[in-house]
Amino acid sequence: MTPRMALLQTLEHLDALDPDHLPVVPLDAYFTGNDQEESIAPNQWEFGRPPIGELYARFQAIAARPDVQGVYVGLHQDWGMALEDDTEWPAAENIHILTCADEPTVLSWLDGLESDGASTGWPYGQHAAAPVPAEGFQVFSVFWD
């Protein structure tokens, strides 16, 4: 099974589990095999956002930090379009970082990614299968316009 098909299968399962909230998947599940530059932050692609491979590497480095519990990708409401088009990767809306770091520190990790910042919490509500931050940790959601 290709990484794309595995991701779509996971997304369909998550959607059935909690259709009222957008699915959240681990960083590697979203980026492995993904070479579609416009699958995340399409409005910043070619306007300063690094290539998708570099974006992935940057978030992998963040995920490896000792003050980070995990990094996850929040899907866009139109992710299901990829079910109808074999050439499309499911669209992502944001990146969620579970960390005990403070906001200025988190924002410093995002330098050069052309994001519009990070807010605390799940912007569209927490999916039933989304990870729960450990005690002393919180969710920062990185977003792009």
What are the residue ranges of the model-derived segments?
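Intrinsically disordered, low-complexity regions enriched in Ser/Pro/Gly/Gln/His and often acidic
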Residues: 38, 102, 135-137
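Acidic, proline/glycine-rich low-complexity IDRs
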Residues: 113-145
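Long, contiguous N-terminal structural blocks used for assembly/anchoring
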Residues: 1-96, 105-109
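Structural alpha-beta junctions
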Residues: 64-70, 101-105, 112-124
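A generic structural motif
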Residues: 93-98, 140-142
